């Protein structure tokens, strides 16, 4: 039995995609009460950064990721994106982090996982291959700031290594990891529109997982949208 067959048969995975500050980590924490263990592609990257740069938990996991470190002269978010994309994805292979994540899930005794940082099309494809439900979190107030970059991508014919290098020069806002899924079709799960309070958003994430649990991971709300506030 291949690792993909084993994961599809023995593990239950939901995965959150969306832009930075859309609420992916919050959603992962919200569904932990259903037995889903939060896990991220970036977990090994954060361990590297804390070992090499001695960043604090708040700098790597908390609200200070985008703040420039006074000693190093760059932000933890920037160096994590550089290590994850420019160093590993672009030189070792685009599947390096998704294979790492699937290997960690496969070797774990836990059977339910919530992936909190899906950012690239190949990650969506690999996760769907093992039966994961992909949940797209949209936060309308942060979407418009990336529109100019989407137009530039269209002219270049998509995300290329050259484009990724250009994005790195623009900074974290325009990094390839923030825009690669903009036009990628997500064929499972649902959209959660995060346009209300934090409590409303957490409840929306829980309600979706309740439906997944009730229908034994069926695509009950496939193609629909769940709003975190009353429209």
Predicted regions and their residues:
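ATP-binding Walker
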Residues: 22
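Extreme N-terminal, non-catalytic leader segments
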Residues: 1-14
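Small-molecule kinase domains that catalyze NTP-dependent phosphoryl transfer to phosphate-bearing small molecules
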Residues: 128-130, 137-231
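ATP-dependent small-molecule kinase phosphotransfer cores
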Residues: 43-111
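P-loop (Walker A) phosphate-binding loop of NTP-binding proteins
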Residues: 18-19
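Post-Walker A helix-loop "phosphate-sensing" segment adjacent to the P-loop in P-loop NTPases
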Residues: 32-39
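Walker A/P-loop
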Residues: 25
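ATP-dependent NMP and nucleoside kinases share a basic, alpha-helical "lid"
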Residues: 8, 37, 100-152
């Amino acid at each position: 039995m291949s690792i993909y067959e084993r994961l599809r048969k023995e593990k239950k995975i939901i995965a959150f995609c969306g832009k930075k500050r859309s609420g992916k980590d919050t959603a992962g924490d919200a569904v932990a009460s259903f037995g889903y263990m939060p896990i991220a592609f970036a977990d090994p990257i954060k361990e590297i950064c804390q070992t090499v740069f001695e960043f604090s938990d708040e700098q790597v996991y908390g609200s200070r990721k985008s703040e420039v470190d006074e000693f190093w002269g760059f932000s933890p978010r920037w160096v994590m994106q550089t290590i994850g994309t420019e160093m590993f994805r672009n030189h070792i292979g685009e599947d390096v982090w998704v294979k790492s994540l699937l290997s960690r899930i496969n070797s774990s005794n836990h059977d339910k996982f919530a992936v909190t940082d899906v950012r690239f099309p190949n990650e969506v494809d690999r996760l769907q291959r093992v039966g994961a439900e992909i949940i797209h979190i949209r936060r309308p107030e942060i979407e418009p700031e990336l529109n100019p970059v989407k137009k530039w991508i269209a002219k270049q014919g998509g995300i290329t290594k050259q484009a990724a290098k250009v994005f790195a020069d623009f900074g974290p806002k325009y990094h390839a990891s923030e825009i690669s899924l903009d036009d990628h079709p997500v064929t499972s799960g649902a959209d959660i529109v995060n346009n209300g309070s934090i409590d409303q958003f957490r409840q929306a994430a829980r309600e979706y997982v309740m439906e997944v649990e009730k229908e034994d991971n069926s695509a009950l709300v496939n193609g629909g949208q769940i709003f975190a506030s009353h429209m």
